[in-house]
Amino acid sequence: MLGSWRAFSEMFCHLRPWRRFCLRKVLPPWLHYSRALSGAEAINALRPFYFAVHPDFFGQHPREREVNENSLKRLSVYLENLQKPGFKSLKPTQLTFYIREKTAQNSSEGQEPVSTTGFRAVRFTLHSSDLLSTVLYILNSCSLPVEHVQSLNTNVHSQPLKEATGMPDRPIKWHRSYYSFTGFKDPDEDLEHVSRVETTLTSWLGSNGKGAVKKLKNSLPLRKELDRLKNELSELLQLSDIRWQRGWGVAHRCSQLHSLSRLAQQNLEPLQNAKGCTIVFTDRSGMSALGHVMLGTMDVHHHWTRLFESLPNYFDLQRRMSALEDQISHLLGGIQVVYIEELQPALTLDEYYSLLDTFYNQLQRSRAPPRPQSLSGLQMILSRYAPSLHELGHFNIPALSDPASLQSFMRTKAQQARENMRRREKLKVIENELIQASTRKFSLEKLYKEPSISSRQMVDCCKRLLEQSLPYLHGMHLCVSHFYSVMQDGDLCIPWNWKKGEAMK
């Protein structure tokens, strides 16, 4: 029996190089070295995927809609766990999605042929502990483009991606006949093509401007309805704000507000507990680390009602969390513990409190003498990675770290941190001025940016925009992102580092 098993394993050992090639195929050459991806950047990078599988587009196909809803929930949990500080390992997660397609394509490994209904099933298993590798694996599994992810890997210290994938240092080169026979794309040929023909802002707006205007005009009645519903609910429940975690379309947002409005008509009393709060429509219900009330878009009214009824308990936990932050601040010389939504994983209040409690207990056990107000005015966030000073001026501190060396590191970098914070404030003022100037010059209805776009990137983008003459932008909604896209409601997305002039020949 043992001999049979050995023979069986030897039979397939020659496939190991093929596995390494598959990893190379999934990860483009420009990502051989890359940095850690933030949660906001991951969501942004996966936008083409979310658009292809969103349940709203499967209204006439309830079975496929349900499959996508359940898979999106599991994917959301996987991605959030991947970003949590101190995580050790994740169980492999098998997911099935139905992908919308306009035209039929040949089936490939792991995919079923396109059905007559205009979608196909895709199955894949997530097992990577690296967020960037996971994002690329999802996009490639669904035959979606990955080129827009390249711009997410600039201006940051790189780390070898091979650690997450087990890839060899030496890239595997295949003869052109291999690509001709298999039908795979030659990455070197694609790279050469991109270098020859590069999209410019003017050419892209010229090709997509009219279509965006049409979509925007069609969405105007729903946009007015959205504003009306938002104002009515904010006034009725005395809310601070209503927001959305993801880039859902206007119709989807209206549907969510109608649902909340019906719940308020049926049972107003529990909802009044949210007075003064910000409501965020997201993937799961609860309270966020920032204290926002999260309404899961896949949950039914019963779940929402239970959440509103339990808000007093959450408010109590908020008070305990604030006290815990003050205690940590005292032990670390007056530094302020903050949660920055754009730079940290999406944590619930319970998860964030548990993280703070773990960090506090570690400080307590070290018995390191507190240094009163030596770090007053500075900020820190809890993260997964080694201690570092962010360009915005805050410290990134791992939840599990040696308190003595931690304090020494922060004292050494304190002066640099203060200088970074002063630069950040000046940069923010410049950014706001440039946004206003750009909005006026191009008569934009709205100019905004993705959460993953830094102030420095936004400033660079707006400065260059102000040097251009772009009549296509009149009356439009313009979003500064990492790639070109026309959203379903007519918003124009452009990369912050857009190219000007004629396309390169």
UniProtKB/Swiss-Prot annotation:
Keyword terms: Coiled coil, Mitochondrion
Source species: Rattus norvegicus
Induction per the UniProt record: Up-regulated during induction and maintenance of graft acceptance and down-regulated during graft rejection.
Cell location: Mitochondrion
Cellular-component GO terms for this entry: mitochondrion
Pfam families according to UniProt: DUF4460, DUF4461
Name of the featured protein: T-cell activation inhibitor, mitochondrial
Signal sequence annotation: none
InterPro entries per the UniProt record, alphabetical: DUF4460 (IPR028031), DUF4461 (IPR027989), TCAIM (IPR027986)
Coiled coil: 216-243
Function in brief: May regulate T-cell apoptosis.
Tissue expression: Expressed in peripheral blood leukocytes, mainly in T-lymphocytes.
Keyword Mitochondrion part of the UniProt annotation: yes
